[in-house]
Amino acid sequence: MSWDQVWIDINIATMSPNISEPYGAIRDAALAVKDGKIAWIGKRCDLPEFDVLATPIYKGKNGWLTPGLIDAHTHLVFAGNRANEFELRLQGASYEEIARNGGGIISTVNACREADEAELFELGRQRLNALAKEGVTTVEIKSGYGLDIETELKILRVARELGKHHHVDVKTTFLGAHAIPPEYKNDSDAYVDLVINEMLPQVIAENLADAVDVFCENIAFSLAQTERVLTAAKNAGLDIKLHAEQLSNLGGSEMAAKLGAKSVDHIEYLDEDGVKALSESGTCATLLPGAFYFLRETQLPPIELLRQYKVPMVVASDYNPGSSPLCSSLLMLNMACTLMRLTPEEALAGMTRNAAKALGIEAEVGVLETGMTADFCLWNISTPAELSYTYGVGSCIEVVKNGRLVHQ
């Protein structure tokens, strides 16, 4: 056998549903890489003969390999911060009250409109580095802090550039319908027209987005407006997803599922009809425990119903300056378990296999199987549950991305 690298003295949490063991585990395992792909994986005792003198061999010291982590929902490119709003919330103001008084998303919009691409790139690079240190190898980045053509395109260009200059893969999402800008305060339909007829065509022309998202909520866009944007995006050949049922139940998840959305995100107020719709369409349910925690919410997503109907649950950071300024995917694993009562295995699946499905890249990454991209992390842990159980100990030792070793 001729391989580019071989990993031994490891255990592997493949996260493959085809292996009955928890985490799809293979103990005392080995893994071989060739041309950026996993060429062989299995028990070490079954490892075929290969040229040990010509092949780099990496010893994992009985640690665990997992798929590279995938953060499938972030707003990572932004300027400014909203620490003052944090203080207001602790004094009793609600997220909705702050938004209705010109704070919230709009304050970040103003900062992003003033920032240039170089500033946004450097801020984004620092945040991407922080996630990468925790084993994240793929990140989704949304726009939505421009709310005008120039700034929305600027944010998406920066996100694309980050993907070109960093080992972390970046998937971009156009979220022009994130909030109603002040200049359209009294005519939100006209702003929706702008998103559909002017912003979206330019985003497509520059190939700046892999998907389109909308914030469907009483303080943002109505169900009818949301459907218009998602339908236009779908007709243009883009994937669609939705911020839905975070503060109330408008039926956005059902509508998005019928349109074939990859995911619906937040979903604290999702009901059983909505869960059924997700199950029937194969749409993922993205849980955002950081926002749930930071906003001190009490309405939990319907975890038991999602289990009952076998809806793939995704766990993501929702990293943003207002409702989840928490740039840590490992912290999200812990919060998903402690706050939302996921099992550690469900949480890890939510940042690997299911997160890949939510981004439409499940044929490439998210599980460790022969033929998949060699995209994995080595952790200094004795069981995969430690990734959710403990936090802050720096247990990610090495990362391999596209078959290339990325030194920590």
UniProtKB/Swiss-Prot annotation:
It catalyses: 4-imidazolone-5-propanoate + H2O = N-formimidoyl-L-glutamate. CDD domains: Imidazolone-5PH. This is Imidazolonepropionase. 4-imidazolone-5-propanoate binds at residues 82, 145, 178, 246, 323. It holds the Pfam family Amidohydro_1. Keywords: Cytoplasm, Histidine metabolism, Hydrolase, Iron, Metal-binding, Zinc. One of its GO terms (cellular component) is cytoplasm. The keyword Mitochondrion does not apply. Belongs to the metallo-dependent hydrolases superfamily. HutI family. Catalyzes the hydrolytic cleavage of the carbon-nitrogen bond in imidazolone-5-propanoate to yield N-formimidoyl-L-glutamate. It is the third step in the universal histidine degradation pathway. It comes from Shewanella piezotolerans (strain WP3 / JCM 13877). One of its GO terms (biological process) is L-histidine catabolic process to glutamate and formamide. Its EC number is 3.5.2.7. Its cofactor is Zn(2+); Fe(3+). Zn(2+) binds at residues 73, 75, 243, 318. The keyword Methyltransferase does not apply. Fe(3+) binds at residues 73, 75, 243, 318. N-formimidoyl-L-glutamate binds at residues 145, 320, 322. One of its GO terms (molecular function) is imidazolonepropionase activity. It is found in: Cytoplasm. InterPro entries: Amidohydro-rel (IPR006680), HutI (IPR005920), Metal-dep_hydrolase_composite (IPR011059), Metal_Hydrolase (IPR032466). The lineage of its organism: Bacteria, Pseudomonadati, Pseudomonadota, Gammaproteobacteria, Alteromonadales. Coiled coil: none annotated. Pathway: Amino-acid degradation; L-histidine degradation into L-glutamate; N-formimidoyl-L-glutamate from L-histidine: step 3/3. Its main location: cytoplasm. Binds 1 zinc or iron ion per subunit.
